[in-house]
Structure formats: C-alpha cells, structure tokens
Regions:
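Non-catalytic C-terminal accessory modules of carbohydrate-active enzymes
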Residues: 117, 272-401
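Active-site core of glycosidic bond-cleaving carbohydrate-active enzymes
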Residues: 7-48, 55, 62-64, 73-94, ...
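Short, glycine/acidic-rich hinge or "gate" loops at secondary-structure transitions
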Residues: 103, 120-131, 173-177, 324
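A glycine-rich phosphate-binding loop feature that marks nucleotide/adenosyl-phosphate handling sites
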Residues: 133, 181-186, 325-332
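Segments forming glycine/polar-rich beta-alpha architectures that bind adenosine-containing cofactors
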Residues: 2-4
C-alpha cells in the first residue's frame, strides 16, 4: 500500500518459498533491508521506548522508517523486525554457509536486547508480555485492538529467543544474554485453548466474541506456520486447537489470506482441505487470467504463499525432521519433484505413484545427520559432504538403498 512494505505478514509471505525452492539469493535484498532497519529501529527504540537494541513496527518504506504509522489498530505492533529475522535464520539453516551467523548475530542480539528491556509483567498471570500491542490486524470485542501480550507476540518471541540462544551457543558468545533470554522465554504466556476448543488469539478468551471472526489475518496461528512450535507430531492437542481456529475463521479471505490458510492446512497434514484451499486460491475470484493473485487488486503475496503451500504439501522441513509427502492429495496420484532444499543444507528429489512414495533422494551439501519421515516411519541418515542417499519404503518402513 502506498509503495511501502507491510511486515506483519505480507513481506514475509513473499519470501516463504525462497529457501525450500532453491532461491536463497532472492533473500539477499531482504537481509540488507533488515540491517538498515536495525539502524533506524535503534533510534526508535531509544527515543520512543528508552530501550537498547532495535525495533520495527508493522510497516516500513524506502527510507526504512521503523516507528508506528497509520492507525493504532495496525501500527502499534512492535514485532515486525523480530519476525523478519526468522528469514535470516532460515537462510543459515537451509544453507549452513560458514561465517553467516557471525554476520547476522548483531541483528539478532539487538532485537533480543530490546525485548529483554521492554517486556513487562502481567499482573494477572505473572507472564512477561509486550504492552501495548495488537494481534494483527484483528480487533477484539471491546471496541479496540490494543491489548497486552497477544498470542502472536509470544510465539514470535519464542522463536527469536530460541534462535539467539542457538546462535550464541554456536559462536561461543554472549552467554549471559543467552541465560537471560532462556529465563524470559519460560515466562512468556503459554499457548491457551479457549472455550470453543480454539487456540486463543489473545491471553483472554475473546475469540468467539470478536467482531470479525472471519478475519483475513490468522496471526495467532504463526506457531503452526511459518513456525513449527505447534505441530501434529509433538503437540497434537494444540494442533487440534489450531485446526478449530481455522474452522472458525473459515477459508474465504483475500488472496494472500487464502495462501496462508493453504500452508496451515498442509502443516496439519489435511491433504484434502489443502487441495480445496489451493483450488480457491487459483480460482477466478482470487487469480487473474495471467495468474497474478487477486487481493483484489493484484498482490503478489498470494502467488508466493501459494508456491510455498504447494511445496509444504509435498515436502516439509522443520524441527529436526524432513517430512516426505505429508499432505499429498488424491488429485496428485503420481509425480516427481527435484531440487527442493531442506534444513541442514540438503537437497531432495521425490517420486511417487498411486499416491505412494516410490523413492526419495537426499544430497547433503556439507554433510551431517538427517532424519527423514514418511507416514510416521522415520529413518536416520549420516552423510558426508556431497553424499547422496536413496530412500525407499518397503513393508511400512523406510530403507536406504546400498
């Protein structure tokens, strides 16, 4: 809007397919933008909050403005920079390039230092929360959007603190900061399940009273995608609550909103629903004849969100595991794909027939340990740099071919 970058979902969605689809060079301009935002954001942190580090709100532009803009119901949200940093973590995790973490560590450290200085204790729960903030861009049922500690903020902070602790450990630096962040992480508000069985969007159980229950944003489901804090394998109860939230929200949305829902259904391993939502995204109401995504009007976020969603249906890489064909719909009974990347600097090719995996090939760029899973059957691989492993299913298990 107005030739600016909206960084409470839209800019991020544009980069969702980059790493997995072997386009890491496309992230370089975003990395430069984050470094520039850290400079303007440091001025905002100092002058607006009296805090160290740096902060960016929901929108920026060519001049890298970092303060809140437009209405409070959109702008007074301090998590934009922290979310963008997840793409820099992904750039390392998918590529594992030597020296990269040293380059970006000051950006992560500065963002963490800001929140370590500005989180406040919720007198009702004792949790450490952002305040004031909003749940982008959804109003709550009290005629306002401002609140303390919306679910999305805590979810982004969990990822930020975890990344900082991991990077500091790998680099052997800032042990005191890591210890402080670990303590703060334990005091963030937990995921909460509301009275309708949904994942709560706010600390309070307001979801069923919100004036826009079918809102285009699904901010509180960040933990399901693009994060993996909530997933069907490790947190099934929370995954069921996220599913309930999606059902309440509905599939109809803007083009990019449908793109986000596609990725969420893929993470829930609901192949049929993901395929249905993909059909909505590519239908005439949300895709123009030239395949441009329709917000409306044209908004490319939905194109890239859809690309990422198709990838997620075929291959997922989160936590410590590579998931093969996790949400393959019956409409795609056979096919193959190659050149997809996974965390740990691996490259994967897949072939399937009659809806079943035929084989997978994984090549390790730098070597290391990989965990592959197909239909809940895991296989551990230890590979040397450049080594290729071919994996096939037999008798309900995965085997590596000699």
């Amino acid at each position: 809007w107005e030739s600016k970058y909206t960084i409470n979902i839209n800019t991020q969605m544009n980069y969702w397919p980059a790493e997995a689809n072997a386009l890491p060079e496309c992230v370089e301009p975003l990395e430069r933008m984050v470094a520039e935002l850290a400079r303007t954001g440091a001025d905002v942190a100092r002058r607006m909050y009296g805090a160290p580090g740096w902060v960016v709100h929901h929108n920026t532009d060519l001049w890298r403005q970092a303060a809140p803009i437009d209405g409070a119901q959109w702008g007074l949200w301090p998590m934009g920079g922290a979310w963008l940093l997840q793409h820099l973590w992904d750039r390392w995790d998918y590529g594992r390039e030597p020296g990269y973490l040293e380059k970006v560590w000051p950006l992560f450290r500065g963002a963490a230092e800001f929140f370590a200085a500005t989180l406040v204790e919720d007198p009702a729960s004792g949790a450490m929360v952002t305040a004031p903030s909003i749940s982008p861009e959804n109003p709550h049922p009290h005629g306002a959007s401002l609140c303390a500690g919306p679910s999305m903020d805590a979810q982004i902070l969990r990822d930020l603190f975890d990344r900082c602790i991991a990077i500091a450990g790998l680099l052997g630096v800032d042990a005191d900061l890591s210890a402080r962040l670990a303590t703060l992480r334990e005091r963030l508000p937990p995921h909460r399940i509301g009275r309708a069985g949904q994942l709560q969007e706010w600390q309070q159980d307001w979801d069923m009273e919100a004036p826009e229950m079918d809102h285009r944003h699904v901010s509180h489901l960040y933990a399901l995608h693009p994060s993996s804090q909530i997933n069907v394998r490790d947190t099934p109860e929370l995954a069921a609550a996220a599913r309930r939230s999606l059902e309440i929200r509905g599939d109809e949305a803007t083009g990019w909103g449908i793109g986000w829902r596609l990725n969420l259904w893929a993470r829930l391993r609901d192949a049929g629903r993901a395929y249905k939502v993909l059909g909505m995204l590519l239908g005439p109401e949300r895709t123009y004849p030239n395949l441009f995504d329709a917000h409306p009007p044209f908004q490319i976020d939905g194109n890239f969100g859809g690309t990422a969603g198709i990838t997620e249906m075929l291959l997922q890489s989160w936590g410590d595991t590579v998931f093969l064909l996790p949400a393959l719909p019956p409409a795609w009974p056979q096919g193959r794909v190659s050149g997809l990347r996974v965390r740990g600097a691996g490259e994967v090719a897949l072939e399937w027939d009659a809806g079943l995996l035929r084989q997978a090939r994984l090549q390790a760029r730098h070597g290391g340990r990989f965990r592959i899973e197909y239909r809940e059957q895991p296989l551990e691989l230890e590979l040397q740099p450049g080594e290729v492993a071919t994996v096939v299913p037999m008798g309900g298990r995965l085997f590596r071919l000699a």
